[in-house]
UniProtKB/Swiss-Prot annotation:
Family of this protein: Belongs to the metallo-dependent hydrolases superfamily. Adenosine and AMP deaminases family. Adenine deaminase type 2 subfamily.
This protein's record includes keyword Metal-binding: yes
Its job: Catalyzes the hydrolytic deamination of adenine to hypoxanthine. Plays an important role in the purine salvage pathway and in nitrogen catabolism.
Protein name per Swiss-Prot or TrEMBL: Adenine deaminase
E.C. code: 3.5.4.2
GO cellular component, one term: cytosol
Residues at which Zn(2+) binds: H14, H16, H194, D275
Keyword Transit peptide among record annotations: no
Reaction equations catalysed: adenine + H2O + H(+) = hypoxanthine + NH4(+)
Length: 317
């Protein structure tokens, strides 16, 4: 079944480039940039990938991202991910990147962007993988900081298809970022946002009504609010769900409890994605395979999930 799932044409709509930094590449970049790491070797680092919640993961994620310093580093990171896409028949990807993670460390915005977009261009020409880049604001920082990031992005507006919102969800509701999302939309950007991963259904309502998003990233807690579920079904608002991430971060205690197939059967346009695959133990095919192994996903359900991902692209073919 793994090979069949791997061969299925699919899109990935919820992937953080910084979260695809595999331990081997992390160590190679640290050596290249002469950065001391707190881990002795790759295996020690892998053992650190045990998280009780989103914040524990984020602490390690930001520590790992510190090895990304040069345009070549960002190219290598993105290219390694695109090779995974090619190997798993991900024909289209819409990855996030977090400029603030890097500009706050003194890395110029244009250096980050040049490395990523250079790789995405080569991914199209050399691998046949289409893409659209999403600039994501960090919600644990202020709206004013997000607006500065938007200002930095405007000279490069053609490089992005959308703006998004990620990082620590609890205590940082979408309403905190209404003004910057209004500005982004006025500048012609589409909008998406993480909501309803650890946060309550109210955060999803806010993302829809205040940020006017095209797609909900995560959204698994929508099932707790029947009126919200009905709206998502009626309006066919896509959800970019990340099963392995949800279990690694204890959103669900184990995969057998995951609600993605329940949502699919109720008519929700759910999709399967890997989120931060280097940290959560699998890329898109591994996420599909986990649903087959633990939830008994059928071939028909897998085809519908894959088709949903292709239908939910912001960049249309």
């Amino acid at each position: 079944m793994y090979d069949w799932l791997n061969a299925l044409p699919k899109a990935e709509l919820h992937l953080h480039l910084e979260g695809s930094l595999e331990p081997e590449l992390l160590f190679a970049l640290a050596e290249r940039n002469r950065i001391a790491l707190p881990w002795d070797d790759v295996e020690t680092l892998r053992k650190a990938y045990a998280f009780n919640n989103l914040q524990e993961f984020l602490d390690l994620y930001y520590r790992g991202a510190d090895v990304l310093r040069t345009e070549q580093d960002f190219y290598d990171l993105t290219w390694a991910y695109l090779l995974r896409c090619k190997a798993q028949n991900v024909v289209h990807t819409e990855p996030f990147f977090d400029p603030q993670t890097h500009t706050d460390r003194g890395i110029p915005f244009e250096v980050v962007l040049a490395g990523i977009t250079g790789a995405l261009k080569d991914g199209k020409s050399k691998l046949g993988v289409d893409s659209g880049l999403i600039l994501s604001f960090l919600r644990h920082l202020s709206q004013e900081e997000a607006e500065k990031t938007l200002d930095q992005a405007l000279p490069f507006r053609d490089a992005f298809v959308a703006v998004g919102l990620d990082s620590s969800e609890m205590g940082h509701p979408p309403s905190k970022f209404q003004r910057v999302f209004d500005r982004a939309r006025n500048e012609g950007f589409l909008t998406v946002a993480h909501a309803g991963e650890e946060g309550p259904p109210e955060y999803i309502w806010e993302a829809l009504d205040l940020l006017k998003i095209q797609r909900i990233d995560h959204g698994v807690r929508a099932i707790e609010d029947e009126r919200l579920m009905q709206r998502i079904i009626d309006e066919q608002i896509p959800l970019t769900v990340c099963p392995l991430s949800n279990t690694k971060l204890c959103v669900f205690d184990d995969m057998a409890q995951h609600n993605i197939l329940d949502m699919l059967e109720r008519g929700v346009k759910v999709t399967v994605n890997s989120d931060d695959p280097a940290y959560f133990g699998g890329y898109v095919t591994e996420n599909f395979h986990a649903l087959y192994t633990h939830l008994g996903m059928t071939e028909d359900q897998a085809k519908r999930l894959a088709q949903n991902s292709l239908d939910a692209r912001l960049v249309k073919p």
